[in-house]
Amino acid sequence: MHRSSYCREETTLCQGVNSTWVPPADTVPEASLTPHSPPAPDSPAPSPKPGYGYSACEEKPGDPRIRRPMNAFMVWAKDERKRLAQQNPDLHNAVLSKMLGQSWKNLTSAEKRPFVEEAERLRVQHLQDHPNYKYRPRRKKQAKKLKRMDPSHHLRNEGYTGGQPMVNLSHFRELHPLGGSGELESYGLPTPEMSPLDVLEPSEPAFFPPHMREDPDPGLFRTYQHEMDFSQEKTLREISLPYSTSPSHMGSFLRTPTPSAFYYKPHGGSSARTPLGQLSPPPEAPALDAMDHLNHAELWGDFDLNEFDQYLNMSRTQGPGYSFPMSKLGGPRTIPCEENSLISALSDASTAMYYTPCITG
């Protein structure tokens, strides 16, 4: 009776602790009494799990990594680093390395000799232990770092999702020659030194009014590279007038916009076009409307038509005239060279006036 109550009490205590049924002591095998029994020798060893000193990229057991033999500085710094770290526990490892390098440079050859001999002994021993050793540096992390620092790598990773390939920027650095083949042949380089005439068609003149473009022979016009600076009153007194003295022709001539960046030169009736040079910026439109109220008699009073015809005949007998700016016609007529220049300029202006009725009419 007493024994059965003791067994019932022991069973209840065991159930309260482990909540599992415990068999009687005489039926439990002897091996199960030990709390931590070692595994049987037949069972395989448990495989190491990642995160406990092992990784998936661990080197193969048959090919362990062999460390390089230490040189003289490493042999000396092995103990010296420990001593400096104990003396300066707050210093960073990089600062310690700088201090060690400076201290090693300050050593004499006699002080370095024992460490050099020890490094040579370690090298010979390493060569005997690993005759097939080959140094293979680990540069994968450095290569990734350089790749991250590459600006083209950032451009590719900017999240460009437009569906179109990115434009190659290398062709903007290449300078194509003007005379070569390609799209830049007819347009020229996009530089400030480019002339405005480079982007025009060969058949279309530059800065000509619409009525001048209808002229059957635009080769009579030639560019003048310097803008002529003279007043409007002086222009009216120096430019020769057409032979027709009717006021209607005079008014139409005044209203015709004459660009000051051009002067006229005949080419003997040939239809060949003169190549256009570099063009100056177009001048401001002259205020010709302010002269409509002037009397036509005052405008015609300073011109002698007979003298003008005499100069015209002389210029035709002497040959083709030289082009001369109109702003230089105000000098004295006593010098022969200036008189010849004046005759040539008047001849050019009269030839231009022959085409005035066709242009304005």
Swiss-Prot record:
Residues 148-157 have a biased composition (Basic and acidic residues). It is found in: Nucleus. Residues 17-65, 127-163 are annotated as: Disordered. GO terms for cellular component: nucleus. Residues 147-208 are annotated as: Important for transcriptional activation. GO terms for biological process: angiogenesis; heart development; lymphangiogenesis; negative regulation of Wnt signaling pathway; positive regulation of transcription by RNA polymerase II; vasculogenesis. Residues 133-147 have a biased composition (Basic residues). Residues 66-134 bind DNA. Residues 234-360 form the Sox C-terminal domain. It comes from the Eukaryota. GO terms for molecular function: DNA-binding transcription activator activity, RNA polymerase II-specific; RNA polymerase II cis-regulatory region sequence-specific DNA binding; sequence-specific DNA binding. Keywords: Developmental protein, DNA-binding, Nucleus, Transcription, Transcription regulation. Expressed in the adult spleen, lung, heart and kidney, and at a lower level in the adult testis, liver and brain. Gene3D superfamilies: High mobility group box domain. Residues 36-49 have a biased composition (Pro residues). Residues 68-81, 92-104 are annotated as: Interaction with DNA. A motif (9aaTAD) lies at residues 306-314. Transcription factor. Binds to the consensus DNA sequence 5'-AACAAT-3'. Also binds 5'-CACAAT-3' and 5'-AATAAT-3' but with a lower affinity. Acts partially redundantly with sox7 during cardiogenesis, acting indirectly through nodal-signaling to induce mesodermal, organizer and endodermal tissues, which then interact to initiate cardiogenesis. Also acts as an antagonist of beta-catenin signaling. Binds target DNA via the HMG box domain. The 9aaTAD motif is a transactivation domain present in a large number of yeast and animal transcription factors. PANTHER family: SOX TRANSCRIPTION FACTOR, TRANSCRIPTION FACTOR SOX-18. This is Transcription factor Sox-18B. The gene is sox18-b.
